[in-house]
Amino acid sequence: MSAARPQFSIDDAFELSLEDGGPGPESSGVARFGPLHFERRARFEVADEDKQSRLRYQNLENDEDGAQASPEPDGGVGTRDSSRTSIRSSQWSFSTISSSTQRSYNTCCSWTQHPLIQKNRRVVLASFLLLLLGLVLILVGVGLEATPSPGVSSAIFFVPGFLLLVPGVYHVIFIYCAVKGHRGFQFFYLPYFEK
């Protein structure tokens, strides 16, 4: 009754007994799998692959016609190898618009042309409305503090002003960063945005 049990080790978890079924027992009657192997890659390889996958995801999520986002921080055109040429490369070669004009338009107003912004125009306008109403109410409260009026408290304007300003600023910044493809900002995280 006091039979000594062998100690359980991590290798025992990878043994397949005859009852478990499987590919078939080895000569010892118990099928064994090979040791666990975890592949470690160099940090720069992972970072480069992560950057490429982010660019691909950004293209799928944030670009209507599949144009590749520029990896250059100043908005310049990056160099690409021939295996990654864009569909739009032929369109760019025939373009009569100068690159500086195109770049200035892209940095200024391109986020308003995003397909998800067009589709959710009401939500974007509501975010801007919250922002503007909050600012107006706070400015009225500041004006009442500067020139007090009997019977009217500035707190009546400050409290609703901050209650409207905070979500307005949050949503406007979040929408802008999601369109620009900043890491951590995606339309998926805004539940009232139709995808």
Curated annotation (Swiss-Prot):
Residues 1-122, 176-195 are cytoplasmic. The keyword tRNA-binding does not apply. The chain crosses the membrane at residues 123-143, 155-175. Residues 144-154 are extracellular. Its main location: membrane. Residues 1-33, 48-88 are annotated as: Disordered. InterPro entries: TMEM134, TMEM_230/134. (Microbial infection) Interacts with Hepatitis E virus (HEV) ORF2. This is Transmembrane protein 134. The gene is TMEM134.
